[in-house]
Amino acid sequence: DAKTYMRMLRVDFKSRLGKTLGIATDNYESVLLFEPPEVPKTGMIQYLKTADMSSIPLFFKPATVRLDSFEKYALKKRKAYLDDKTWYIYIFTTKKAYQRQGYGRKLMNLLLSFAKERGYRLCLETNLAANIKLYESFGFNLMDSSFYKGRLEHYVMLYGNR
């Protein structure tokens, strides 16, 4: 309904050099952030660099190099499913104490109805096989399944007709 759509907040993330939209439950028990098709997709390291977080402690440097390498891999995988009709779900999270109580489902259903009404698709990624069933329950289809460097799971899922 119109009142619910008005709760969709436009958030301008400097670190994304674009627009990210977000919705949250009243007390932020669950948060869902997503990007429209025209927003350039970057990896997490680029996100942090643009956010001017250059003072990452030295002991985190090896981890950020590994993360950057994985992000490049993930970006290549998801780009195959992104086009001018596909929104990208960047973050979907619910605080542990509020999981399995419908908070996340409420937000996801809102986004799904928005996409369906306007003829958009939605793309998301997960690194947990256990999440696949959850996303399938919303109507997402598993499009790509791979292992980064043979050990880190990576799944790309798509909602809507392609």
Regions found by a protein language model. Give the residues of each.
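Conserved beta-strand-loop-alpha-helix junction that forms the acyl-donor binding cleft
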Residues: 90-99, 123-133, 148-152, 159-161
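Conserved active-site alpha-helix within GNAT-family acetyltransferase domains
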Residues: 105, 117-118, 128-145, 149
